């Protein structure tokens, strides 16, 4: 059975991405979510996509150089709140699937914190474009559902090669790969991002999709 996740909690166009309000709505509809993780200067793991606040809050400051308090002091001016991962875990009530994508490089300290935060979760995966993140967390705890994320320009041969790595349990790739039959040789779960219309959802109903707009 295909697995459907909502991209950054964007179940509706009116929602703000990676917010507790958006996540809660997805959970009421019985959908899991995909979200992005960064670490702040004071080592708080937050749900936020970009490396800086420039796009969202018109402030050209990097997440890694700001504390959690400083980030939300800026976000508040835009009527926004950037949540911590632990807040997301709490509202998921251990019933809804969480795909946690590590956007930035996570230190050993950050990864250990992540492992501790997720140790009671039943339904989740940890993914990243940065293979070092996945290798390093595998060293710390092997029995985790870990995955690599690939861009739309990644050669299929490279994807197939990476799929054979022992620490790669799932693969996440751009939706242009949905029609690529060569990937059928991979005997691991594959997720495709980001489906933004119901036509794709219907056409590929047998695939694991990360989508927006119910």
Model-derived regions, located:
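Phosphate-group recognition and catalysis centered on beta-loop-alpha active-site segments
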Residues: 1-214
């Amino acid at each position: 059975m295909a697995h459907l996740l909502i991209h950054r909690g964007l179940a509706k166009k009116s929602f703000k991405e990676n917010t507790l309000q958006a996540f809660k709505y997805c959970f009421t509809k019985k959908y899991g979510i995909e979200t992005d993780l960064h670490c702040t200067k004071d080592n708080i793991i937050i749900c936020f996509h970009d490396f800086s606040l420039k796009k969202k809050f018109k402030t050209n400051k990097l997440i890694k150089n700001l504390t959690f308090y400083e980030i939300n002091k800026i976000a508040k001016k835009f009527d926004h709140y950037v949540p911590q991962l632990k807040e997301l875990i709490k509202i998921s009530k251990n019933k809804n699937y969480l795909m946690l994508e590590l956007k930035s490089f996570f230190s050993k300290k950050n990864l250990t914190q992540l492992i501790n935060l997720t140790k009671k979760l039943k339904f989740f995966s940890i993914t990243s474009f940065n293979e070092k993140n996945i290798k390093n967390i595998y060293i710390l705890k092997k029995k985790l559902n870990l995955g690599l994320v690939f861009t739309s320009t990644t050669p299929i041969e490279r994807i197939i090669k990476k799929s054979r790595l022992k620490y790669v349990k799932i693969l996440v790739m751009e939706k242009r790969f949905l029609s690529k039959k060569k990937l059928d040789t991979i005997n691991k779960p594959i997720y495709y991002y980001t489906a933004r219309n119901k036509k794709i959802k219907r056409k590929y109903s047998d695939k694991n999709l990360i989508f927006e707009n119910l």
